[in-house]
């Protein structure tokens, strides 16, 4: 059996880790052991934040919708209720984009949602 020397493979692995650690501060960018830990931690953060990104963007769309809908005299929750009752199925991202780029079209959607809501006289908004 021939002897296998692993210098080339280990060098390639080290290069790969150091390339991923590029831009890190201190020994994290040039010491293999520390760089490997930093890169792995970075990957954990990236995995976690790919999930959080979805939550964050949904929250942003809801905030934008709430602000846009209040200009038309509704709250976000009443608006969503009105959309459901009127049978309009549009996601929050699309509604948010509509509110920003097509205010006239968004106003029409809000009016449809308002029309589907029962008129509540006991509560003066």
Curated annotation (Swiss-Prot):
Q: Tell me the CDD domains matching this sequence.
A: Ribosomal_L20
Gene3D superfamilies for this protein: 6.10.160.10, Ribosomal protein L20
Q: What Gene Ontology biological process does one annotation of this record name?
A: translation
From the UniProt record, which GO molecular function terms apply?
A: rRNA binding; structural constituent of ribosome
Tell me the keywords, alphabetical order. Answer: Ribonucleoprotein, Ribosomal protein, RNA-binding, rRNA-binding
S-S bonds = none
Q: Name one GO cellular component term.
A: ribonucleoprotein complex
Q: Which family does it belong to?
A: Belongs to the bacterial ribosomal protein bL20 family.
Question: PANTHER family in the record, alphabetically?
Answer: 39S RIBOSOMAL PROTEIN L20
Functional summary from the UniProt entry: Binds directly to 23S ribosomal RNA and is necessary for the in vitro assembly process of the 50S ribosomal subunit. It is not involved in the protein synthesizing functions of that subunit.
This one is known as Large ribosomal subunit protein bL20
Species of origin reads: Methylobacterium radiotolerans (strain ATCC 27329 / DSM 1819 / JCM 2831 / NBRC 15690 / NCIMB 10815 / 0-1)
- Give me the gene this protein comes from: rplT
